[in-house]
Amino acid sequence: MAGFPGKEAGPPGGWRKCQEDESPENERHENFYAEIDDFAPSVLTPTGSDSGAGEEDDDGLYQVPTHWPPLMAPTGLSGERVPCRTQAAVTSNTGNSPGSRHTSCPFTLPRGAQPPAPAHQKPTAPTPKPRSRECGPSKTPDPFSWFRKTSCTEGGADSTSRSFMYQKGFEEGLAGLGLDDKSDCESEDESNFRRPSSHSALKQKNGGKGKPSGLFEHLAAHGREFSKLSKHAAQLKRLSGSVMNVLNLDDAQDTRQAKAQRKESMRVPIVTHLTNHVPVIKPACSLFLEGAPGVGKTTMLNHLKAVFGDLTIVVPEPMRYWTHVYENAIKAMHKNVTRARHGREDTSAEVLACQMKFTTPFRVLASRKRSLLVTESGARSVAPLDCWILHDRHLLSASVVFPLMLLRSQLLSYSDFIQVLATFTADPGDTIVWMKLNVEENMRRLKKRGRKHESGLDAGYLKSVNDAYHAVYCAWLLTQYFAPEDIVKVCAGLTTITTVCHQSHTPIIRSGVAEKLYKNSIFSVLKEVIQPFRADAVLLEVCLAFTRTLAYLQFVLVDLSEFQDDLPGCWTEIYMQALKNPAIRSQFFDWAGLSKVISDFERGNRD
């Protein structure tokens, strides 16, 4: 090393091969090693044969570095340099004599590390060697010396007892795990690193007296219980690890799948929406399953998805958006329904907020679906090989049916009802499948489902929901026989439904039937709502827009009481009605783009 008498500058023998390479990179390494060698003598005074004193390196501070740049020796809690290994250990591992230049290196070797072996030797595991303490090489190292030097353990019997408790706990913990003095996991040389017994520790603390204090006697008396507790804890840990290994046979694969799922769930859906894709145009008929809660809409959708596969796109109910995005609208709505605080403005405001949140996913998805419609191809009658777009509910339920039920229950004011009704939209080709079921069977299925927020719903609630669907269906029938302007005139009180029937040049419905339909429809409720302000143009436009939009829909009625646990039979009934009704038509969609959009909605609903 540079600056040492009789020594040549340059890296140690283990790196001579790198020095022989004349590449620019290795030349820089050589200069760096030379700088380190020049710097070494000025940092620490060399010991051993280089110093001329012939003294041993008891502290083990001067070791051969394992890699360049070398690391400084670690320091303990008290700021003192922690001894790593003795000079004898370095000599045995590296093959260097105690007087060689490697022992004069001012840098320490981390504990357990080994300098790189020469090119002709295979790397071997380091062999632990006993360390020598500052007080002399003949004494056993005390691993708790750093603990006794800290400020938290200095002074008094309490500090001695705390140190003893840590030491005793470690010994009993090793005994509980079955690690004796000659454990299989340690070599014989490592037995010298054993912590001193409690008696020797007390002997050092009490001035050579072997008899412990009162607290030590108490701890020693309970040492057997402490050992038993540690042993039981170790057995329980090994048992739990065995059970987990049995249950997770492919732990690495499960970890990869979990990471992939987290990465997939963190993907932003808008990126998928806007990415380019090859359009795949297919004809498809859009069906929207409607009905009271618990009639079996989701069960039917899952069955059809399993049967038809890629020929079907299933749009689930946006339950996650309703329950996990901001506040839980489902919980808040059922809370207001079960408390039955009728006729209050604050209740109506809370119900309005919930209903507006219910309408948002339907309006967003309808707008996105409309953008993927191929209008140039037009529409045609439903064919047997057409695809199907199956929705769990339509915007009709969130903006018309349930608001009407809440209005009749006096949970929603007239003004708030108009606000929700104005959000109703529909597209030509939307077909509503009204799944009817008697209240008793519906209640049984609702209890079987066991949703917590539905526990307060009773048969009266289900009956009111069915009545609201019936009112909307009767209103839709009127739109099939009369012009929207004539119906609005009836709602405004300018004429009657009977007069409209008599003035028709080609009456296709009798006045008695029309009168009955009108009384059971939502139009009779609208007449009552707008009566105080029937001259207001905004209210009249809301009624007119609702009537025109309602006429776009088509209805399919299915009585589920006739198909008890018969999903294929129920679908056959829906399918045959769709084929026989010429007003129900298929439209051409970008099937690839629509599949991506729906998959993002499904992913958000699952997360």
From Swiss-Prot:
The catalytic residues are: 317
Keywords (alphabetical) are: ATP-binding, DNA synthesis, Early protein, Host nucleus, Kinase, Nucleotide-binding, Transferase, Virion, Virion tegument
| Keyword flag Acetylation | no
Record's keyword annotation contains Glycosyltransferase: no
Gene Ontology terms for molecular function: ATP binding; thymidine kinase activity
E.C. code: 2.7.1.21
A biological process (GO) of this protein is: TMP biosynthetic process
Where does the protein end up?
Virion tegument; Host nucleus
Region Disordered, residue ranges: 1-160, 180-215
Catalytic activity of the protein = thymidine + ATP = dTMP + ADP + H(+)
Could you tell me where the Polar residues compositional bias lies?
88-106, 148-160, 194-203
Which segments show compositional bias classed as Basic and acidic residues?
17-32
Where is it found, in Gene Ontology cellular component terms?
host cell nucleus; viral tegument
Additional detail: Phosphorylates and thereby activates certain drugs like acyclovir (ACV), valacyclovir, and famciclovir to a toxic form, that leads to successful suppression of the infection, while the uninfected cell does not have this ability because it lacks TK.
Assembly and interaction partners = Homodimer.
Which family does the record assign?
Belongs to the herpesviridae thymidine kinase family.
HAMAP family in the record: HSV_KITH (MF_04029)
Q: What name does UniProt use for this protein?
A: Thymidine kinase
| Species this chain originates from | Epstein-Barr virus (strain B95-8) (HHV-4)
